[in-house]
């Protein structure tokens, strides 16, 4: 019988569904089906909103399962809310030198934000069982709300859509690593 590495239980299922949605969204993006891609990004964000809450309901998780959950969540977040939005924004018009620099800035800050979160969350879970109340910096998942809103506005913005997209990606990427406290939404 074949066995697989990793942990496969209900605590990570929404994380994997989120990843599936984002991979589908990337494929929609490269085929020019932007409405479907944006929908996939929003669905991925919705899954990510609840994955931690579901994981915390399993009270008998081992330390390895908890650590795996932190790591797999961040790895999936980098694909879902890092790489996927970069591909989508590039395809929607951020193709010049300024756009490419902004997208690289966004991606770099996404990685830094997730790495910092992993270190802090691992330490926090060793010290307390309490649910986190605040994030340091804007969570990377926020792009699943911001980018669809900017996309919906493209019919209104028309000639200014590219500017709005550039500004949104730069501001959101910067807020990932800005030392601000962001209240965690209650699910």
Residue ranges and their predicted role:
Residues 1, 5-15, 31, 35, ...:
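Membrane-water interface of alpha-helical transmembrane segments
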Residues 2, 125-187:
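C-terminal membrane-associated helical module and adjoining short loops/tails
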Residues 48, 107-120, 170-185:
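Transmembrane alpha-helical segments that form the membrane-embedded catalytic/substrate-channel core
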Residues 11-16, 57-114:
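Multi-pass membrane catalytic core of lipid/isoprenoid biosynthesis enzymes
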Residues 1, 50-67, 117-133:
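Cytosolic, membrane-interface loops and tails of multi-pass inner-membrane proteins
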């Amino acid at each position: 019988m074949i066995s697989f590495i990793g942990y496969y239980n209900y605590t990570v299922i929404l994380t994997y569904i989120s990843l599936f949605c984002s991979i589908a969204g990337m494929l929609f993006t490269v085929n020019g089906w932007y409405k479907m891609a944006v929908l996939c990004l929003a669905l991925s964000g919705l899954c990510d909103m609840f994955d931690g809450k579901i994981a915390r309901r399993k009270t008998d998780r081992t330390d390895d399962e908890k650590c795996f959950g932190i790591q797999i969540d961040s790895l999936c977040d980098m694909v879902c809310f890092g790489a996927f939005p970069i591909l989508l924004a590039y395809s929607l018009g951020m193709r010049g030198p300024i756009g490419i620099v902004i997208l690289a800035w966004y991606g770099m800050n996404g990685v830094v934000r997730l790495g910092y979160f992993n270190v802090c969350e691992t330490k926090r879970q060793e010290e307390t069982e309490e649910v986190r109340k605040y994030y340091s910096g804007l969570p990377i998942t926020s792009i699943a709300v911001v980018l669809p809103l900017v996309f919906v506005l493209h019919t209104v913005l028309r000639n200014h859509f590219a500017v709005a997209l550039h500004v949104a990606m730069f501001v959101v990427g910067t807020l990932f690593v800005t030392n601000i406290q962001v209240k965690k939404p209650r699910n």
